[in-house]
């Protein structure tokens, strides 16, 4: 889910931001468009993903800590996009957010939560969300259960596209309001002051 958001954001085109994708699943990473991308935890997952285990996602992110630090070192604001309930997003996103915060960046978690019928994923998602909240300045949650209200009777892939569009438009709006001179002048210091 997180890399799908990232790819959608990249394709939308955001002025003033670098779009970075990281994943434990090499195949999925290969099909995502981004300015920069890298595999998390190659030694832990061998590029095959985390199998839904958040501990493995955290371990993979920790293994790639130097690459994460290098990618985020000069960032003023970092949006950490992830799907909660699986392995990589649930376990890895809080580690990435922690690194971003250590650089002094404003950290905004942007996550999707699983459907209630995905019971096994819901508990993991709640745990991951709490961890992410602990290390982020704010977290924006898109609940898949509410997606049904927004997307109506659309097929599931189109409903997810609606969510990705919503997230991408929001991030683009925030970034470009700060980075691109316009009639509405909001600078980074203003944002830092309200976080």
Predicted regions and their residues:
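Tubulin/FtsZ superfamily GTPase core signature
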Residues: 1-195
């Amino acid at each position: 889910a997180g890399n799908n958001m990232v790819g959608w954001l990249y394709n939308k085109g955001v002025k003033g931001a670098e779009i970075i994708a990281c994943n434990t699943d090499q195949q999925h990473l290969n099909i995502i468009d981004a300015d920069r991308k890298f595999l998390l935890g190659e030694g832990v997952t061998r590029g095959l993903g985390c199998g839904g285990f958040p501990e493995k996602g955290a371990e993979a992110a920790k293994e790639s800590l130097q690459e994460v630090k290098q990618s985020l070192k000069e960032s003023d604001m970092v949006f950490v996009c992830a799907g909660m309930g699986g392995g990589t997003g649930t376990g890895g996103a809080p580690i990435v957010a922690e690194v971003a915060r250590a650089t002094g960046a404003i950290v905004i978690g942007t996550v999707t939560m699983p459907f209630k019928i995905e019971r096994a994923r819901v508990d993991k998602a709640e745990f991951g969300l709490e961890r992410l909240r602990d290390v982020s300045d704010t977290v924006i949650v898109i609940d898949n259960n509410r997606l049904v209200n927004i997307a109506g009777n659309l097929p599931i892939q189109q409903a997810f596209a609606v969510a990705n569009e919503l997230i991408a438009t929001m991030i683009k709006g925030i970034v470009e309001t700060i980075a691109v001179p316009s009639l509405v002048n909001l600078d980074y210091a203003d944002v830092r002051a309200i976080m």
